[in-house]
Amino acid sequence: MTLAPYACDPAQSRGRRFAEPAAPTRSDFQRDRDRIVHSTAFRRLVYKTKVFLNHEGDLFRTRLTHSLEVAQLGRSIARSLHLNEDLVEAIALAHDLGHTPFGHAGQDALNDCLKQHNPLSAGFEHNLQSLRVVDSLEERYPAYDGLNLTFETREGILKHCSRRNARQIEAREPDGVARRFVDQKPNGPHWRQPGLEAQLANLADEIAYNAHDIDDGVRSGLLTMAQLQDVELVDQYSFEARQQHPGLQGRRWLFETIRLMLSAQVYDVMDATRAALGQALPGDVQAVRQSAALGRVRKVNGAIS
């Protein structure tokens, strides 16, 4: 597939922290993906849950299954927009490597502990921990710590970051992956947001958990379709599912509702991104990073955010 001019081209990557020779048969972003899949932290995702505890059932999502779903959605969107599928997949597979067990409750508990231990601390941020995993904590290679991923993959992993933590990263790595959280001057030398591949991996994450947390909630018995129909979006697509398939009941009704919701949100992302690209007309990935119009891609007509 031919990449769009505004896509991240591995041949134009800003490189790795430690220089390495290119691989003969794989692009740099393919190598990033492969390193993530073979990492210890990736295997550990199988025991980290999103909402329910691991022992409560083998059909509930874990961080591993969620990451695979995010990668699948991300690749589909990237292909339609002529973006780099390998980069989207690498970011998607790595985005939860630093997440705590017990979902966001675990993150909140660690955050409180860190702030009590050091009142000056910016606390625990799972995106920052994901970056630590790939930069420092993995010990697989003789010449360096971490996975030595490309700048573009690391930039996408750092989805959120407090300014205090970003400044600490910048002190070690000036003009690096955290720069956009430190200095966001309009039309300045730095950028407002990462490339489109990182933004789409972020959106694929939101689409995946918005839909699949519904599935897990109903499967657990904590939610019913009747309760979910109080949510406008669910009500709309559950009605549409029965219009298309009269008499649809039970889990098939739930699955068809979720499928319709997923499809609508994916197409909404594609349409909103194309509209923003038509407004911004970026000539390369750096223009994407600096474009105010493309910083609004996340909003997606309010259906996701």
Residue ranges and their predicted role:
Residues M1-S67, A71-I77, E85, G123, ...:
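Histidine-centered, transition-metal-coordinating active-site segments
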Residues G103-Q116:
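A glycine- and small-aliphatic-rich helix-loop capping segment at beta-alpha/alpha-beta transitions
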Residues V88-L93, N202:
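Short alpha-helical catalytic segment bearing the HExxH-like zincin motif
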